[in-house]
Amino acid sequence: KTEFKFGTESRDYYSFEAPGGEMIYYFMFGKDYKEIMGHYIGLTGKPIMPPKWALGFAQCRGMLTREDLTREIATGYRKRGIPCDIIYQDIGWTQNLQDFEWRKGNYKNPKQMLADLKSQGFKVVVSQDPVISQSNKKQWQEADSLGYFVTDSTTGKTYDMPWPWGGNCGVVDFTKPEVADWWGAYQQKPINDGISGFWTDMGEPAWSNEEDVDRLVMKHHLGMHNEIHNVYGLTWDKVVKEQFEKRNPNRRVFQMTRAAYAGLQRYTFGWTGDSGNCDDVTQGWAQMANQIPVLLSAGLGLIPFTTTDISGYCGDIKDYSAMAELYTRWVQMGAFNPLSRIHHEGNNAVEPWLFGEEAEQNVKKAIELKYSLIPYIYTYAREAHDAGLPIMRPMFLEYPYDMETLDTDAQFMFGKELLIAPVVKKNAKTKNLYLPEGNWLNYNDKRTLYSGEQWLTVDAPLSCIPMFVKQGSIIPTCLLYTSDAADDKA
């Protein structure tokens, strides 16, 4: 626990204190933000390079844990010609936490399902949690006998962790070196079946709402939990990535997580977690708007490959027509996240065709726009890998000496050439935005040219997202496909 004392003890100085002895400070400076980020990447490491298919669209929901539903969603996308590359399986896909076995009764023939989806051009990403359920007796006893669990310092026994699903669990101690190969062998099982990556969830480690349980008594191989907590997720991410590469040479890893630490970009991608209005899902406008600065901050923190949960995740959808406008605007904004995943909690379906014909067509248009820009996005993905610069950039990163760009968190640069200004207000049909120096072409009509260094209001019907390209830019695009198998190696 860190204590900050800003003027409470003296007006002459501010101070803070933390347990654990002396701290090491890193002071980074430079002529601009890009130079400072270069110093940070030198300290914490280069981001992993994603496979090309990771830059497309993904579909998920909390109860997407059945073969028949997965096939139904895949067919729905291909039937309607809406591009999509990835279908996720949430935590219920596995028989027990965390044995990496397909749930009996939910999956008739998972290997055949994965082969069929691959032939349709889909990748499948599955969830994993960093725990072993006590109801999973065989694996739990194995890990317990090997000493692979975090222990309770008050008893010396395996720490009994309440978990939101699967019952009480043992927390896997990824700070112990021997755990890596053991976990890697388990996670390789669905990879051998044909899955393409992992979604590492609940890595804080999260738990149930039992406030009387004190996790600070947890003892890891490398120390007590108050010392390990912030880096626990990172130790897990490291094992998942390194074991994937060890057992699957010449394949790029796909891992997406919400819990990590400085340096996570070496192992994983990120997502922002639950972000909607849980009380009224149709009123999540402010929450959606807030995702823009959250994602921009992630990019500045050297997490260049991120996504929001498109739709907001939180809350039951009781009226799809009432949510259609918000859903459309969320997809439009999410199309310009480096990664793009539509996801909602429970069994709330969030496929585009459920929100009405107009929403389906507008969403399809937004997704097709992203796919047409894949060559452009992939180019900047490589720059993110090499230099750590985000694809989704705050305005001041490209225009550091323009004071107007310092407070423009409702728009952003997508690479250096494209300016994106998502509509984040209900019933809005216009968008107020700022154009920095230079001349800017309206990307939607390819005709209207505006001079820079001015604020202006542009039309923003529900069918489009305000988007501008700097005059003189070259924007590589590609033809769309919705049924061919994607490139596994790129």
Q: Can you annotate each of these PLM segments?
A:
Residues K1-K470, C478:
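Catalytic-domain carbohydrate-binding cleft regions of carbohydrate-active enzymes
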Residues Y481-A486:
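Conserved small/polar residues in nucleotide/adenosyl-binding loops
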Residues K489-A490:
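N-terminal low-complexity segments that are often proline-rich with Ser/Thr-Pro
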